[in-house]
Regions:
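Short, amphipathic alpha-helical interface elements at domain boundaries
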Residues: 2-38
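Surface-exposed beta-strand edges and their flanking turn/coil or helix-capping segments
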Residues: 32, 42, 89-92
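Winged-helix/helix-turn-helix nucleic-acid-interaction surface
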Residues: 1-11, 16, 51-114
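Short, well-structured alpha-helical interface segments that form or flank functional binding sites
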Residues: 22-26, 42, 53-57
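Short acidic, hydrophobic short linear motifs in intrinsically disordered regions
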Residues: 35-52
Length: 114
């Protein structure tokens, strides 16, 4: 799995992102750091040291379309493919295959539910 992550100004400089609380913005950054090469994170428990890892901040990210939450508790960074391209020789496919089967990548490079 790649160890570097990118954050795109095209995503984080949108008014809808800047209108989020500071806690939700910080949580988004932590989620990006913890995500696998396809943008999946094993829920909030994956980032226990982040003081902003609250259900309230997560709900803000979900309702704003920045994170997708699955029934399993797994999270997905909706704009992952817009921000991160992992070299083929460093890419490790996600272990969350059931969740990945529930989304597709739209024309603008964002994950959407099927």
């Amino acid at each position: 799995m790649a160890e570097r992550r990118m954050i795109s100004k095209k995503v984080i400089y949108k008014n809808s992102f800047l209108d989020l609380s500071e806690g939700a913005i910080a949580l988004y950054m932590f989620l990006i750091i913890e995500a696998d090469d396809d943008g999946f994170v094993d829920g909030l428990r994956r980032i226990p040291r982040c003081p902003f890892a609250t259900e309230e901040n997560l709900s803000l990210l979900i309702n704003s379309g920045y994170v997708i939450k699955f029934r399993s508790g797994v999270l997905l960074i909706a704009h992952w493919k817009k921000q991160n391209v992992v070299a083929r020789d460093r890419y490790t496919p996600t272990e969350y295959k059931a969740e990945k089967a529930q989304v597709y990548i739209d024309d603008d490079g964002s994950y959407r539910r099927v």
